[in-house]
A protein has these predicted regions:
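Acidic, proline/glycine-enriched N-terminal capping motif
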Residues: 1-50, 59
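Glycine-rich, small/acidic residue-mixed loop/short-helix segments
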Residues: 163-170, 185-267
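Short, conserved charged micro-motifs
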Residues: 16-21, 71-75, 104-107, 127-132, ...
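Residue-level signal for inorganic ion chemistry
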Residues: 14, 64, 180, 221
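Anionic-ligand-binding alpha/beta catalytic cores of soluble enzymes and soluble regulatory domains
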Residues: 122-201
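Short amphipathic beta-strand starts and helix->beta connectors
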Residues: 40-52, 83, 104-110, 184, ...
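A common structural junction motif
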Residues: 28-29, 78-87, 130-137, 218-223, ...
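Acidic, low-complexity central loop/insert segments
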Residues: 2-11, 51-146
Length: 267
């Protein structure tokens, strides 16, 4: 079990909590049963992802996890749209979130949520837990499952499909309106998504800040890609989560950033 200090949790309560989240987020919250969880995007009116969220239902309440660097701003923005909705929400400072293997036994003093689209499980608890792993190990698993939480430097830069969030159940194309829904749907049905997520690995240690541009050698041509997230695992190498022009047949052979030029590897 690994404590995820880069995430925070907010509680949404009140008779309209579910319908409010349904109207604001890209996932179909209305079909979420108690004890279940789903990823969702909170998007700008232009369809760009402000933050990835994990929505966990507990009875008539919802625990919503998101990047600590973004969640306070997300809640402030959501507060502008409460109007007459009977919903209250606030960050739960005493609640922590842990990552654990899906096959691990239930933990004491908390609720485990397993989003169906990924092979990951999250424990939300306000009680101490015995953590025995590193955040980098967990981030490696998340990136390999197409989960990246975004940061201020990458917020409002990409529509959900560019990040592959439609592949982790974070976008419903059959639900009603939400901010940016028209643009997200149009991009899907008109085939206008020209950039997609691409994992790039190298056996070397390569530190690249989110939002920075790297170059990839694909089919003997250098093309630019934007780094969304990355992790370095000792004795393993670096894994970069990038958004790059879609070229399914062209696997990168080299990655270049500044003075660094490395062979791509498999992690």
């Amino acid at each position: 079990m690994i404590e995820l200090s880069f995430l925070s949790v907010a509680r949404f309560s009140g008779p309209d909590a579910g319908s409010f989240l349904q109207a604001q987020l890209s996932a179909d919250i209305a079909v979420l049963a108690s004890g279940k969880a789903a990823f969702a995007c909170y998007c700008s009116p232009r369809g760009q992802v402000i933050s990835l969220l994990l929505v966990c239902r507990e009875g008539d309440e919802y625990l919503v996890a998101g990047a600590s660097a973004l969640l306070p701003a997300v809640l402030r923005r959501l507060g502008m749209f409460v109007l007459r909705s009977k919903v209250e929400f606030a960050i739960q400072s005493g609640m922590k979130i842990f990552g654990q293997a899906v096959e691990d036994p239930p933990s004491i003093g908390g609720s485990v949520f397993k989003p169906e689209a990924v092979g990951l499980a999250y424990l939300l608890s306000d009680q101490p837990q015995l953590a025995n792993g590193s955040e980098d190990d967990w981030k490696l698993m998340e990136l390999n499952n197409n989960v990246t939480w975004l940061e201020p430097a990458t917020s409002e830069k990409f529509i959900p499909q560019m990040l592959g969030f439609d592949n982790i159940g974070a976008v419903s194309f059959s639900k009603g309106c939400y901010p940016g829904q028209e643009i997200v749907a149009r991009a899907r049905y008109l085939g206008k998504v020209k950039r997609k997520p691409l994992l790039v690995a190298t056996a070397q240690e390569l530190w690249v800040e989110p939002g920075q541009t790297i170059e990839l050698l694909r089919a003997e041509q250098w093309t630019a890609a934007t780094v969304v997230d990355s992790v370095f695992v000792r004795d393993t190498g670096t894994l970069l989560f990038t958004v790059a022009p879609e070229k399914p047949e062209d696997t990168p052979s080299r990655v270049r950033y500044g003075a660094h030029d490395y062979l791509c590897a498999t992690i």
